[in-house]
Amino acid sequence: MIDPLASPGSAPLIVIAGPTASGKSALALRVARRFNGVVINADSMQVYRDLRILSARPSVEDEAAAPHALYGVLDGAEVCSVGRWLALADGAVAAARAAGRLPILCGGTGLYLKAALEGLASVPEVAPEVRAEARELLAALGPAALHAKLAELDRAMAERLRPSDAQRIARAYEVVRGTGRSLMDWWSDPVATPALPGRPLLLVIDPPRAAQRAACDARLLAMVAAGALDELALLLARRLDPALPVMRAVGVPELARTLRGEVGLAEAVERAQGATRRYAKRQGTWIRTQLRPDRVLSESLVTQLSESQLTDIDNFLYAFLLTGAS
């Protein structure tokens, strides 16, 4: 069905987006098996080898059922910026097409998805000493205080960021200090890195709130049962910089407290469940307001869709692949 000789600009690209625990991976796997596809990760935590369980990466069985790419490819000591991910994704899409397979992006990291569909503005390299200053201030003062400093230099950007969002606060601070321009100004410049080549079809999963919250709670319990605490103990033993993305993944700070003996397991799990629900809510809001889907699946979680509903999705995709109509 996928012509490896087709022009990259006209070749189909399926994008499946949605909040955590909504069933994205299950749908992507189904599409990959039915349409000879490769599932390509668009989740900023699932790129790390250290977090198979806590990032809800596809299981070994799922990875054996269909090809997957960009899952567990980076060490936790690294940072996977949007630009770096976009370059990796571009290579993965090209490799899928060269093999005659359908590339299927799957994830909930909004900035990754937006870059894939719209491209990425160019932000110049910040001088190492300015970057070091931002990291030192973050370590010494904490994210909330650095957020206040950012507001003095770039109020508009500060208003977009939560005071606890350490990584993005430090990035915004170093850009405005190093370039004299807000990161928002750089984003508004003409695109320097193009979107992923192809004819995209965007499916968004937007399940009912109650079902989403229940799925988040159940997933966290399943992670703990599957060995999340053992996985986390290995990560903490590495003594990585607490500001690294892998150390701030949803569930990591909350469950780490029980490993340090600060709270009991039940309280840590409850806190991690709450963090997961809040994260899913933010993801859903961002996706609804920032992306332009070709189809929204809002009836239920993917895992609760009937076979007839799933078949309808298959037919929708089949029509797109044959004609380009959505």
Curated annotation (Swiss-Prot):
Site annotation (Interaction with substrate tRNA) points to T109, R131
**Names of the cofactor(s):** Mg(2+)
Q: Domain of life, per the record?
A: Bacteria
Enzyme Commission numbers on file: 2.5.1.75
The region called Interaction with substrate tRNA is annotated at 43-46, 167-171
One biological-process term from Gene Ontology? tRNA modification
Which GO MF terms are attached to this record?
ATP binding; tRNA dimethylallyltransferase activity
Catalysed reaction per UniProt? adenosine(37) in tRNA + dimethylallyl diphosphate = N(6)-dimethylallyladenosine(37) in tRNA + diphosphate
Q: Which residues bind ATP?
A: G18, P19, T20, A21, S22, G23, K24, S25
Q: What Pfam families does UniProt report for this protein, alphabetically?
A: IPPT
Keywords on record = ATP-binding, Magnesium, Nucleotide-binding, Transferase, tRNA processing
Binding of substrate, residues = T20, A21, S22, G23, K24, S25
Function summary: Catalyzes the transfer of a dimethylallyl group onto the adenine at position 37 in tRNAs that read codons beginning with uridine, leading to the formation of N6-(dimethylallyl)adenosine (i(6)A).
State the oligomer form and interacting partners.
Answer: Monomer.
Query: Which family is annotated?
Result: Belongs to the IPP transferase family.
What name appears for this protein in its UniProt entry?
tRNA dimethylallyltransferase
Organism, per UniProt?
Answer: Rhodospirillum rubrum (strain ATCC 11170 / ATH 1.1.1 / DSM 467 / LMG 4362 / NCIMB 8255 / S1)
Gene behind the chain: miaA
